[in-house]
Regions:
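Secreted, disulfide-rich extracellular signaling modules
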Residues: 1-196
Length: 196
């Protein structure tokens, strides 16, 4: 078979406050969400689409999925800490019933590139199998990815430890929308002659 791999790439629009080594993790989302129509620096601010509190739109009455196992035994977790907010923060697949972890982490520091480039082969393989109806016990619906800070940063109230990174969206009018970058080896090595 041919060898292949895939990376999830997301390109930085603005970055502030990354003053120490910090990890961000990327997870497959566990439920459908509405993209919204807002753009950076809208005046007035556009607030339709998903938010910290809901995957739909404010006032929809729909909440992010609570932590626990779903119908295919994938473990779902969510980002909120009741100390800071009563609910919200997204819901993502953490691991499969076989113990496979879905999160991929990337480290950032003051001088590192802030673009995301993480290996997504495990998740994309599950999405592909799900779309074909292959191996239903390992199916994983494709709702996209969520990126979050490690918990020590996400829920830290110290103003010295509050990095903010904004990435270009799928609706950007630039050449930097998020993307899956596929790579494959489309040749086979053939040895000729003899080794003595």
């Amino acid at each position: 078979g041919k060898q292949w791999d895939v990376d999830f790439r997301s390109f930085i629009a603005t970055a502030e406050g990354v003053v120490e080594s910090t990890d961000a993790s990327v997870h497959p989302l566990a439920q459908y969400w509405y993209n919204g129509t807002g753009t950076y620096l809208d005046i007035p601010l556009t607030t339709d689409g998903c938010s910290w509190n809901t995957p739909n739109f404010d006032g929809s009455g729909v909440s992010w999925t609570d932590s626990g196992s779903d119908s295919t035994n994938h473990y779902v977790t969510s980002s909120y800490d009741t100390t800071y907010a009563p609910v919200g923060g997204g819901a993502w697949y953490h691991s499969g019933s076989d113990g496979t972890l879905y999160a991929v982490t990337q480290s950032f520091d003051t001088r590192s590139s802030k673009d995301l480039k993480i290996n997504a082969k495990t998740v994309v393989s599950l999405w592909y199998s799900s779309s074909l109806g292959v191996n239903s016990s390992a199916s994983l619906p494709n709702y996209g990815f969520i990126t979050k800070w490690e918990s020590g940063v996400e829920f830290n109230t110290n103003t010295q430890i509050q990095p903010v990174m904004q990435f270009y969206s799928v609706d950007t009018n630039t050449i930097y929308p998020p993307q899956l970058e596929f790579k494959w080896r489309d040749y086979s090595s053939v040895l000729t002659g003899s080794a003595t």
